[in-house]
Amino acid sequence: MTTVRTRIAPSPTGDPHVGTAYIALFNYCFAKQHGGEFILRIEDTDQLRSTRESEQQIFDALRWLGIEWNEGPDVGGSHGPYRQSERGEIYAKYAKELVDAGHAFYCFCTAEELEQMRAEQMARGETPRYDGRALLLSDEEVQRRLAAGEPHVIRMKVPSEGICVVPDMLRGDVEIPWDRMDMQVLMKNDGLPTYFLANVVDDHLMGITHVLRGEEWLPSAPKLIKLYEYFGWEQPKLCYMPLLRNPDKSKLSKRKNPTSVTFYERMGFMPEAMLNYLGRMGWSMPDEREKFSLAEMVEHFDLSRISLGGPIFDIEKLSWLNGQWLRELPVEEFAARVQKWAFNSDYMMKIAPHVQGRVETFSQVAPLGGFFFEGALKLDAKLFESKKLSADQVRQVMQLILWKLESLRQWEKDRITGCIQAVVESLELKLRDAMPLMFAAITGQASSVSVLDAMEILGPDLTRYRLRQAIDLLGGVSKKENKEWEKLLASIA
């Protein structure tokens, strides 16, 4: 009997996302319920954005939740390497096989040519897609341009008509017209694969039998199915999971909800409760109970109990569930967990240098630096009153800073300062006009330790969460303002 093997393949390009944890949990439970294996693979072919720091955060976040893997970059295994950046020769080999078999082709089109092509198609009211012009090149012309070292990509061929039937374990057969599919790039001009080629090759070579992934990948499933057909490989069973959503039913995003697992760890949520809550996202126990452990979820896991309606990720409900778990802890364990969460040596050593020089007694530490150990702050709107700025300008400055910080990939003091500086300069203000607002939002006080140091220590999610909290306290942002301010944001360097 074939061993069930599932996997999660996150990209290490930022903080570990709760959506990644959600998909990892369901893949883990499916594998373990069938006595199988769960694999962790790192999709790090985006060389500009991928970092080993983000990779380690993924490891730490999943382990904090209690999700362990049988094979992966840090534990090894017989199907490695488990980082896509280390599998370049493998992808090149299989891409060449597709070209030699006539299923893929070399494309030498420049970015300018592609942009012009799409502009002309849109002007004609057509859906932008590659028009196949490279297929008209003769073999001699292709070889000449390859020999000359001309930049190129490898694209797959796709049918121009007909229907692709996607067998989904949740929805049954889903029909998708081939004319919606573009001639997908498989190998980029830097020699690295795109998601589609790497995904198919890795899943096959690693013996993945079942793929549970987010439903946002369903529209592009025909490309993956066609690649399996081209290679002559059996495709894994496919299951497209419903996406997590904000309370307003929009797709879960960091603009409306904290999305990093590390945020919830820092906020003092229990990993058991977090995992329990993610397990309830579109799935339920046979007896409908709300509180259950990972072991209980594995024991009773059944895909047929997954609802296709977009599950709502609601922090208030998560907090309620966390309270159920927390209050059932023995007092000794409760005390130990509080100490580990708030007063662990690593976190204290980050804070101590910024507090020590500002206090005369230990009793002054809590009033000065207590905000380091809180989640949502009790804010006073009076703290945001400014002699220089109107109430609308206060909200505008804070919202633009929040948006600017959302684009920050490396969370460092100098870069945080640069974001704030860019916003105030674009508004023809001074840094001193914005900093009191930042003190108020981040620390809940008019003055404290360096707010820039505090933001670096608190991290991106908690910092952005507090800025959103302050903006909401001051009345939020209207649709009209949102539209106008986003245009302004686009002009900020």
UniProtKB/Swiss-Prot annotation:
A motif ('HIGH' region) lies at residues 10-20. Its EC number is 6.1.1.17. One of its GO terms (molecular function) is tRNA binding. It is found in: Cytoplasm. Its main location: cytoplasm. HAMAP family: Glu_tRNA_synth_type1 (MF_00022). This is Glutamate--tRNA ligase.
